[in-house]
Amino acid sequence: QKLNVENIDCRIDGAEIGKHGRAGYIFNSKINGIDEADALLIVGSNPKIEAPVLNARIRKRYLQGNFPIALIGENNNLTYPFNYMGSNSIDIKKLRDKNHETYKILMDAERPMIIVGMGALTNGSGPAILHELRELGELFGVIKKDWNGFNVLHTSAGRTGALDVGCLPSKKGLSAKQIFSESENSNISFIWLIGVDNKEVLNLK
C-alpha cells in the first residue's frame, strides 16, 4: 500500500485462499494434533513428498491403531493404508452419502481431521472445493469448540507468513496468474519477485 501497488500476490501457484480468515489457510491443529486425531481425510495432497515429517507423524499415529485414513487425490504410496475414494472434486460429494464408509467413520470420530493440499486448491474449482470441505468439516465435527482439525498444507514455506501480512491483490489488483499473463502480453513491464523460486516464474522474460 505504501508503494501504491495494487498488483501483489503471494499465491504464485494460483491457490485462491486467504480471503476468508486465517483459519482458512493454516494448519490449525498443528502437527501435534495428529496424535489426538482419530480419523483422517486427505484431499489433494501427497504428504510423503510435500511434508515428509508430517507424513511420518501420520504413519506413527496409524501404527498406534484406531486411525482410519481416506484419500481423495492422486493414488500414491503414502507408507500407510488408506481408503481411496477417487481423484476428482466430484468424489468429495461422496462424503455426503450417509451410507458411505468414510461418512460413517468421520461422523463417529471424536476428533476427525481433514488435510487439504494445494492439489485441490490450485485449479479453477479451488474456492468451491474449500467451501465444500469447510461445510463437511462442520458436519463431521472437524471444526468445533474444543477442536479444529481443518488443516491446509502448503507447498511453499513462506506462504502462511505472506498471507498473514496481507500479500494479496487489492479489489482492483491482479492475481499472480493474471500478473504473469499480463506480463507475457507486455502489459506489465516490471515484476518484483521477493523470495520466489516457484516453477511458475521460470519462463518469465
Show which residues each predicted segment covers.
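Catalytic alpha/large subunits of respiratory electron-transfer oxidoreductases
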Residues: 1-205
